[in-house]
């Protein structure tokens, strides 16, 4: 239903029989009055009541944080480092998969290479003892 705007000189009861249920009357002081057909009283609405309430965007997604920014990466922590290696090929996952920041991704890569050179980690596959570890990255493998 479209509302019809009726301009009134003052606030008075007017009978509108063939129009929609609400009319807006402008008074001399600048306030708006809403006239309802069903009720004989006029409700005055100030212009500040109709303004939207400022609030945060409810659809905004929270910012992604690097999960290792507060942690220290060590080449001897093989269980942590094995989470960032593919169990089938032994390749190191990239930033788009791990979700790490650039600084921590470089540290992880250097620590993995150092652990592989020093013999703490295998080069080609993930150690079977760590296959059932909780997943750090949200990666799904084909079964």
Swiss-Prot record:
A Pfam family that the UniProt record links to this protein: Ribosomal_S18
Chief location category: mitochondrion
Alphabetized UniProt keyword annotations: Mitochondrion, Ribonucleoprotein, Ribosomal protein, Transit peptide
GO annotations of cellular component type: mitochondrial inner membrane; mitochondrial small ribosomal subunit
Cellular location(s): Mitochondrion
GO molecular function, one term: small ribosomal subunit rRNA binding
Keyword Mitochondrion: yes
GO biological process: translation
Highest taxon of the lineage: Eukaryota
InterPro entries xref list: Ribosomal_bS18 (IPR001648), Ribosomal_bS18_CS (IPR018275), Ribosomal_bS18_sf (IPR036870)
Known partners and oligomeric status: Component of the mitochondrial ribosome small subunit (28S) which comprises a 12S rRNA and about 30 distinct proteins.
Family named by the database record: Belongs to the bacterial ribosomal protein bS18 family.
PANTHER family: 30S RIBOSOMAL PROTEIN S18, SMALL RIBOSOMAL SUBUNIT PROTEIN BS18M
Protein name: Small ribosomal subunit protein bS18m
Source organism of the structure: Bos taurus (Bovine)
């Amino acid at each position: 239903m479209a509302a019809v705007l009726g301009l009134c000189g003052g606030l008075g009861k007017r009978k509108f029989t063939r129009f929609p249920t609400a009319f807006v009357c402008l008074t001399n002081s600048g306030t708006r009055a809403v006239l309802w057909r069903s009720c004989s009283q006029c409700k005055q609405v100030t212009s500040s009541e109709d303004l939207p309430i400022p609030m945060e965007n409810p659809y905004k997604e929270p910012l992604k944080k690097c999960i290792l920014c507060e942690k220290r990466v060590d080449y001897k922590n093989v269980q942590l480092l094995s989470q960032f290696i593919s169990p089938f090929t032994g390749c190191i996952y990239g930033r788009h998969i791990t979700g790490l920041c650039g600084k921590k991704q470089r540290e992880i890569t250097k620590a993995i290479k150092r652990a592989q050179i020093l013999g703490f980690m295998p080069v080609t596959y993930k150690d079977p003892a760590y296959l059932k570890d909780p997943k750090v990255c949200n990666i799904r493998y084909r079964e």
